[in-house]
Amino acid sequence: MKTKNVKLLFFFFSVSLLLIAVVNAAEGHSHGGPKCECSHEDDHENKAGARKYKIAAIPTVLIAGIIGVLFPLLGKVFPSLRPETCFFFVTKAFAAGVILATGFMHVLPEAYEMLNSPCLTSEAWEFPFTGFIAMIAAILTLSVDTFATSSFYKSHCKASKRVSDGETGESSVDSEKVQILRTRVIAQVLELGIIVHSVVIGISLGASQSPDAAKALFIALMFHQCFEGLGLGGCIAQGKFKCLSVTIMSTFFAITTPIGIVVGMGIANSYDESSPTALIVQGVLNAASAGILIYMSLVDLLAADFTHPKMQSNTGLQIMAHIALLLGAGLMSLLAKWA
């Protein structure tokens, strides 16, 4: 199990560094060619004013992420937060609404805007790549979800055949283990989708030279990280990960956006968000992230919980969960005005 935890650490760490390096390299290599003058920044930028918001955002966003992801994990201390309680179902519905709105209202529109920018003059981009990439990402997420669960189930069935047929309770144990594994796969894939988006939006804040834009992103990101942390923390709690795995996953979620902000600040002077290479790289990453988040929220979070026997047998819980879902999606959609 320790080896798996180490592999998990290196996996998420490598993904984070790779994404940061790709975006950074894209900006560095885009200065040799002609530049597109599609800048959205005000000509009279106050870099000093923007910098104070960036510096303040690093610890604030970090703390907001920690609070969000740890809240559902406190079930061991507070019984009302345990996965089997009604409060947990309602909280998870709210978080699923947040993640769904993140995919539809934040990430997908950004990807569409980037991949349909007038700065991209190539005829190849007349094809609707945004939806295509999001669709492929959703299909790949489905494949990872089903193949990982199927692989574990087959291997476990082979082992269980060696046990005497006279033993009872084996079927229920197998089913429980498969469900736990599937929840773990869901948590890891969901974190990957969130990390991709977090790196991109963190770099956007760090590279922003406008105080107004930096302030708006700063405020929006606080709630953004906290709300997304609720959804991820809920999946981690249901996956029954060991303490080290919980620490690793929670830490990577919390630090990814602050790392993106720091990288953005480092490349702010050379960053050209309207360069074709940067638009393509960030557009593709955002589209893929949107596909992952939309699939995970609808299939693995909402569908799983809303068809759960506990939910189906409790009309009051269903109503509360739907209200929480609409509230989470509504609040996150409102944040799209600023970020």
From Swiss-Prot:
Residues 26-54, 108-123, 206-216, 269-278, 337-339 are extracellular. It holds the Pfam family Zip. Zinc uptake is inhibited by copper, cobalt, cadmium, iron and manganese ions. It is a multi-pass membrane protein. Induction: By zinc starvation. InterPro entries: ZIP, Zn/Fe_permease_fun/pln. This is Zinc transporter 3. GO terms for molecular function: zinc ion transmembrane transporter activity. It is found in: Cell membrane. It comes from Arabidopsis thaliana (Mouse-ear cress). Keywords: Cell membrane, Ion transport, Membrane, Signal, Transmembrane, Transmembrane helix, Transport, Zinc, Zinc transport. Belongs to the ZIP transporter (TC 2.A.5) family.
